[in-house]
């Protein structure tokens, strides 16, 4: 009988139940809430679901995920050594149509203006006591680009990766709720009714030349983001060249889906209780909202400048699409415009600043890496 009891005690002490802490329990509950949001509310389910499950698994004690070489540690290496974000960018490039930006290159300025949110949040984070590397990682949330946020944070402040990723993807899913009030605050009803002319046709040569030129210029200007921009442009070249259909299909479907699973699960695995349950996490979530709101406002206000300069030919609503939540932000511009003018179709015009925002966020990340990467 004593042997049986000792065996039971041994099983208990070796189990995860005995080592479970209050922090682990809280983070498992956080993971369950994220699963609920992903499944029941459909908030970025392709990303939040693996993040949530990774979070839950990370808070099981005595698993050896962080110490024993295995699939979980290998997934972590994919983030630590910057493998997954560039591969995601290849898929994004294959799914992105740069035609609206090529047809109206002035909208590149709107994509740049929307990055003001990144630097507003960076300044706010430094005022709250974060160091410059942590502040830069928090600020990039304002670009509304999950892979870029993960890429920059894994280089500058890997201990903040879980909080930054959850904030970035949460706000991306809430674009239709966050942006419209800010857009209406920065515009009048008459301005929202402005119709824009149709975009000119874009030639095949322009579509092929654009990713090549962007890859060369940005990579030479900002070498720290050469892998992101190179993969983005390569994926786009697969799509527009007309001769690599199989590669394009693989990049934007099978490969992108596989890497998304690994990237999101690996991000969730960083969300251990000792790293996540801090006052800093709430500050990051609040600063992320400030960054996103400031980026939206910055894009719309620059759209106002373009409206004035063009003699009321530019609808300032397209400026809000300068954040790189593709194509959600462009759809929001379209929806808000339709409410005040049911015959106003802004989607294609808004796609210009939207895809410019993808490039703009990568450039902002590269600038901060060059300045603060040390």
Regions found by a protein language model. Give the residues of each.
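Transmembrane helical segments that form the transport core of multi-pass membrane transport proteins
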Residues: 215-299
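Interfacial helix-loop-helix linkers and transmembrane-helix boundary segments
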Residues: 40-48, 65-68, 72-75, 95-110, ...
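Small-residue-rich segments of transmembrane alpha-helices in multi-pass membrane proteins
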Residues: 52-59, 112-123, 142-149, 213, ...
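Entry/N-cap segments of selected transmembrane alpha helices
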Residues: 32, 101-122, 273-299, 350-354
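N-terminal alpha-helical transmembrane segments of multi-pass membrane transport
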Residues: 1-70
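Membrane-embedded hairpin module used as a gating/binding unit in multi-pass transport
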Residues: 170-243
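Alpha-helical membrane segments and immediately flanking helix-loop junctions
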Residues: 81-82, 89-95, 110-120, 124, ...
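Alpha-helical transmembrane segments
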Residues: 159-177, 287-295, 318-319
């Amino acid at each position: 009988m004593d042997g049986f009891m000792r065996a039971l005690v041994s099983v208990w002490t070796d189990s995860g139940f005995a080592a479970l802490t209050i922090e682990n329990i809280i983070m498992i509950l956080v993971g369950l809430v994220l699963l609920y949001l992903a499944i029941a509310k459909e908030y970025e389910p392709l990303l939040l679901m693996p993040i949530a499950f990774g979070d839950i698994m990370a808070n099981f004690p005595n698993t050896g995920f962080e110490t024993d070489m295995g699939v979980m540690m290998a997934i972590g290496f994919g983030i630590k050594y910057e493998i997954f974000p560039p591969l995601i960018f290849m898929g994004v490039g294959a799914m992105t149509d740069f035609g609206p930006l090529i047809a109206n290159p002035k909208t590149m300025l709107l994509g740049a203006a929307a990055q003001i949110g990144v630097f507003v949040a960076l300044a706010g984070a430094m005022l709250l006591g974060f160091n410059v590397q942590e502040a830069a990682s928090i600020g990039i949330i304002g670009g509304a680009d999950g892979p870029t946020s993960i890429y920059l944070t894994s280089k500058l402040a890997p201990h903040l990766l879980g909080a930054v990723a959850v904030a970035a993807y949460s706000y991306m899913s809430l674009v239709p709720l966050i942006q419209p009030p800010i857009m209406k605050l920065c515009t009048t009803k008459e301005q929202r009714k402005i119709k824009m002319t149709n975009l000119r046709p874009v030639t095949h040569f322009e579509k092929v030349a654009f990713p090549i030129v962007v890859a060369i210029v940005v990579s030479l200007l900002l070498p720290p983001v050469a892998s992101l921009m190179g993969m983005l442009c390569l994926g786009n070249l697969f799509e527009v060249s007309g001769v690599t259909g199989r590669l394009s299909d693989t990049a934007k479907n099978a490969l992108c889906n596989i890497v998304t699973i690994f990237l999101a699960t690996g991000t969730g695995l960083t969300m251990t209780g000792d790293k996540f349950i801090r006052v800093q996490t709430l500050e990051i979530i609040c600063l992320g909202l400030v960054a996103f709101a400031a980026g939206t406002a910055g894009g719309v206000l620059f759209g106002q400048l373009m409206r004035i300069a063009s003699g009321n030919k530019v609808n300032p609503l397209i400026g809000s699409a300068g954040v790189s939540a593709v194509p959600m932000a462009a759809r929001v511009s379209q929806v808000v415009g339709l409410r005040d003018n049911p015959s106003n179709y802004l989607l294609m015009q808004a796609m210009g600043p939207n895809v410019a925002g993808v490039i703009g966020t990568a450039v902002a990340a590269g600038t901060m890496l060059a300045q603060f990467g040390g």
